[in-house]
Amino acid sequence: PHILHDLGYGNRVVHIPAGPDIHLKKEDLYKFIPDYVQGILEFSKNKGIRYDLIHSHYWMSGIAAIELQKSWNIPFVHMFHTLGVMKQRVARENEEIEGEYRISGEKEVLNHANRIIAATQAEVAQLLWLYQADTNNVVVIPPGVDLCHFYPIPSDEAKEFIKVPVCNRMLLYVGRIEPLKGLENLLKAIAIMREQVQVEAPQFCLIVIGGNPDLTPQTTDTEMAHLQSLREQYHLQDFVAFLGQRDQNTLPYYYSAASAVVVPSHYESFGMVALEAMACGTPVVASQVGGLAFLVQDGITGFTVPVDDPQALADRLMKLLYDDDLREKLGKQAAAFAKQYGWKNIAKKIIDLYRTVLSKDGNE
């Protein structure tokens, strides 16, 4: 195992070999969970380490946690982040449909975990409605944001740092390039906006961060190809730029350079991009789905719009882009709102949960 020791006092990452040393599809990783569990057991035995509690993330790690719980006889808490049944319900393409093995695995995790952490009350409702979960075993603790990394940067400084040609009013999308993320609707909204903007008005543009925009005959990213085709179809070459992936350390500059950040997803269990943007003092326009409906406060930190409604999305984006006073007001309110999600606050809630689970009452 490869061990990293640079995460601060009491923290380290241990890389456990499991499966072949080749790139695997997500659905193939499941087969190697037994190898992963065995590697963890051998590592702890060889190092003489006794763990008190397991905190697993995402469903496959939850399956591993069940096996480790059996071997070590210790409690575990789990956070799903996304749910298979929800992804099935909103899937736009066949490849986005989750296998039944995932859903049965999630149910198994629900039956074994000492506590389930949900990001929002929306996720609690989904666990009850779709999985018949015991909500007495579920606690809401949202993900946190690093306020030392994501904070407001003066717009001119941010635009100078990112060194990409940006327009006077810049919209920003950050995330994976897949149908579930709703980028097709965003391009439709941009096309509507282009028709509404007067020639003499300050122009706007959309910057898309994520994926690989360099298409070749061997490209397997069909969604990126589809979106670039739509950009041409709608004559948006001067309005939309696909930048590809960017280093995490540069994201605060992109967020701060933007007039608004757009999250047009069909499903988000939480919406980390929205939280990072708000921490940088940038208002967010997001779909009214899942965690986004709780995270983005309509008319206060940004706007929420019905999913699959490009016209409503265009209307809200236009309002933010061309009402400077409103944009500044919502941006300041967004930064203030995001402070409650700082890791200092969230970490305390997680530590309190650990103490509860480790106590006698928590293990009953």
Q: Language-model segments: what does each one mean?
A:
Residues 210, 219-246:
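Nucleotide-activated donor-binding/catalytic signature segment of Leloir-type glycosyltransferases, i.e.
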Residues 151-164:
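A short helix/loop element that forms part of the nucleotide-sugar donor recognition site in Leloir-type
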Residues 266:
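Aromatic "clamp/platform" in nucleotide-sugar-dependent glycosyltransferases that forms part
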Residues 283-286, 296:
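Short hydrophobic beta-strand element within catalytic cores of glycosyltransferases
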Residues 122, 144:
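Carbohydrate-associated surface elements
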Residues 245, 253-258, 350:
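Short alpha-helical donor nucleotide-sugar binding micro-motif in glycosyltransferases
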Residues 1-51:
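A conserved catalytic-core segment of Leloir-type glycosyltransferases
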Residues 298-299, 303-310, 319-324:
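Conserved acidic donor-binding segment of nucleotide-sugar-dependent glycosyltransferases
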